[in-house]
Amino acid sequence: MATVFERVKKVSVEQLGAEEKDVVPAASFADDLGADSLDQVELIMALETEFGTPDAKFEIPDTDAEKLKTVQAVVDYLKSKGIKDS
């Protein structure tokens, strides 16, 4: 059973090459995990893939993506959109 946080952490490690120990709720993608703007776009796309299903595409609008600066912000956003721990 994977929590939303664990899934966000997995995607962050894969996309950003970050160390697992560094991907904590308060971590900033840019400041703590070294993501540049392109990395952040690719991270959002990977999150859309991770949390979408073949039957229900999951999309994070650019206006929302711009606000997702930390790991916890992403977790909170996903939960607000109905994503649950599995």
Swiss-Prot record:
Keywords: Cytoplasm, Fatty acid biosynthesis, Fatty acid metabolism, Lipid biosynthesis, Lipid metabolism, Phosphopantetheine, Phosphoprotein. 4'-phosphopantetheine is transferred from CoA to a specific serine of apo-ACP by AcpS. This modification is essential for activity because fatty acids are bound in thioester linkage to the sulfhydryl of the prosthetic group. Pfam families: PP-binding. Its main location: cytoplasm. Pathway: Lipid metabolism; fatty acid biosynthesis. Gene3D superfamilies: ACP-like. It comes from Dehalococcoides mccartyi (strain ATCC BAA-2266 / KCTC 15142 / 195). It is found in: Cytoplasm. The keyword Cytoplasm applies. Belongs to the acyl carrier protein (ACP) family. Residues 2-82 form the Carrier domain. The modification O-(pantetheine 4'-phosphoryl)serine is found at S37. PROSITE patterns: CARRIER (PS50075), PHOSPHOPANTETHEINE (PS00012). This is Acyl carrier protein. The keyword Lipid biosynthesis applies. GO terms for molecular function: acyl binding; acyl carrier activity. One of its GO terms (cellular component) is cytosol. GO terms for biological process: lipid A biosynthetic process. Carrier of the growing fatty acid chain in fatty acid biosynthesis.
